[in-house]
């Protein structure tokens, strides 16, 4: 298994705490001017990576989100899409958990700093309990 844990900003005020993510978009891929959809990498068929489970959607990009992005997902981060895509291509099991650290707004930077350690502790306790014995 490849496990991704990290913090994320929520674009949905009803999402908080530690969540599992199952759908991944590349939120800052924008070549609509060439006829592709927002989030679509040119000459690739898939607009997103979907795991075989239920969970939230995540838009990954190269920026810390402080305003609503054009490609709207449940949460935003800066790394999960690349892990999900790598694992899909290489047929590796992948699970992804995010701790909601902020609401991807003007206060995101301050909120993230406060939530970072709390999220790591919650994930550690959760993972030890739920995935005892899993080989990573």
Residue map of PLM features:
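Glycine-rich phosphate- or other oxyanion-binding loops that anchor nucleotides, phosphorylated ligands
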Residues: 1-136
